[in-house]
């Protein structure tokens, strides 16, 4: 019998694998790699939290650190067991971060680059908000833009509506030509002179200053409506030359039309139908030169209204009678 002080063989068998496991080099390397991996993850998480704490403004910091515990406490059921080691470590890290933030706030050494970045973000976000305004606000702005300029009443609005119905690439050309047509008479259009010659270092203002006053006003209104006046100097010059060349070509075509006249585009009216003429054509088709010539075996007297030929067999009408 086994003595009571002697360990049981089962306990000895349980100790041997554990000792062999901890003495094994592969298990040690695996544990070391896992430990290094966990330390690396902990370091990265701490860096992320520090970046969030320094980059975000002070108003958003309490919401980050206070809102998650509230949601967890309200949703989680009451538990009787003690908190695990991971929870204790997370609480320690959060408390340490809070204390670090308090000390930084008290010393006044917070990084100001984060606030500058947020201000730039808010400034950049305010610009698209102005672009993505409601239709009423855009209509009010368009009315302000359309009201400017010494043009006939409603001319700019009609030009904008006509340009909106065309392709996007041709909208500025259509807009400018429509305003010019309503602002200039045909006699004035004959004497229009548009200069496209540019010199080295010339700007759009210099080029438009050498044009006629009405041409200059039309081009300036077009560039203002399509916000081309906010472009660079070279881009403004190219856009102004584009509009001027289009106006010059259209003025040439319009002057040629006024001088030579426009051909009549209306198709001539069809003459009324003559019933006698229709019957004559129908009889000509039934005559010897018509279908009769195509069918030579058909006797001519059938077409001419004569009697039937004896070669055609006669059909007894009594065959189609039905006895009552």
UniProtKB/Swiss-Prot annotation:
Residues 67-151 are annotated as: Disordered. Residues 67-85, 124-133 have a biased composition (Polar residues). Keywords: Nucleus, Transcription, Transcription regulation. It is found in: Nucleus. Residues 134-146 have a biased composition (Basic and acidic residues). This is Putative transcription factor sel-7. Disruption phenotype: RNAi-mediated knockdown suppresses the hermaphrodite gonadal development and egg-laying defects in a lin-12 mutant background. The gene is sel-7. Residues 106-123 have a biased composition (Acidic residues). GO terms for molecular function: identical protein binding; sequence-specific DNA binding. Widely expressed, including in pharyngeal muscle cells and body wall muscle cells. GO terms for cellular component: nucleus. GO terms for biological process: lateral inhibition; negative regulation of transcription by RNA polymerase II; positive regulation of Notch signaling pathway; regulation of cell fate specification; regulation of development, heterochronic; regulation of mesodermal cell fate specification. Putative transcription factor. Positive regulator of the lin-12/Notch signaling pathway. Binds to specific DNA sequences in regulatory elements. Involved in cell fate decisions that require cell-cell interactions, such as the anchor cell (AC) / ventral uterine (VU) precursor cell fate decision. Heterochronic protein which controls the choice of stage specific cell fates, including the larval L3 stage-specific fate of seam cells. Involved in regulating the temporal expression pattern of hunchback-like protein hbl-1, thereby playing a role in the progression between larval stages L2 and L3. Its main location: nucleus. Multimer. May interact with mediator complex subunit mdt-29. Residues 86-98 have a biased composition (Low complexity).
């Amino acid at each position: 019998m086994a003595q009571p002080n002697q360990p049981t063989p089962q306990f000895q068998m349980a100790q041997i694998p554990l000792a062999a496991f901890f003495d094994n080099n592969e298990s040690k390397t695996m544990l070391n790699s896992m430990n290094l991996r966990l330390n690396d993850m902990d370091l990265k998480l701490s860096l992320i939290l520090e970046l969030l704490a320094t980059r975000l403004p002070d108003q958003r910091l309490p919401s980050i650190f206070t809102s998650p515990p509230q949601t967890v406490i309200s949703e989680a059921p009451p538990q009787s067991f003690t908190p695990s080691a991971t929870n204790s470590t997370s609480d320690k890290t959060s408390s340490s971060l809070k204390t670090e933030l308090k000390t930084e706030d008290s010393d006044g050494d917070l990084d100001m680059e984060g606030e500058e970045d947020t201000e730039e973000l808010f400034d950049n976000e305010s610009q698209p908000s102005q672009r993505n305004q409601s239709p009423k606000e855009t209509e009010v702005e368009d009315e302000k833009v359309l009201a400017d300029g010494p043009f006939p009443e409603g001319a700019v609005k009609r030009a904008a509506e006509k340009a909106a119905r065309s392709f996007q690439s041709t909208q500025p050309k259509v807009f400018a030509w429509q305003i010019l047509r309503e602002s200039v008479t045909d006699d004035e259009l004959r004497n229009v002179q548009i200069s496209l010659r540019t010199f080295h270092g010339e700007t759009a203002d210099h080029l438009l200053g050498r044009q006629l006053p009405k041409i200059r006003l039309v081009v300036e209104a077009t560039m203002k409506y399509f916000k081309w006046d906010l472009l660079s100097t070279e881009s403004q010059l190219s856009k102004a030359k584009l509009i001027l060349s289009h106006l010059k070509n259209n003025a040439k075509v319009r002057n040629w039309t006024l001088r030579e006249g426009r051909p009549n585009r209306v198709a001539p009216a069809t003459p009324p139908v003559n019933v006698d003429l229709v019957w004559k054509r129908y009889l000509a088709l039934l005559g010897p030169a018509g279908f009769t010539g195509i069918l030579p075996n058909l006797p001519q007297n059938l077409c001419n209204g004569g009697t039937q030929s004896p070669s055609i067999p006669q059909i007894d009408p009594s065959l189609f009678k039905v006895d009552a």
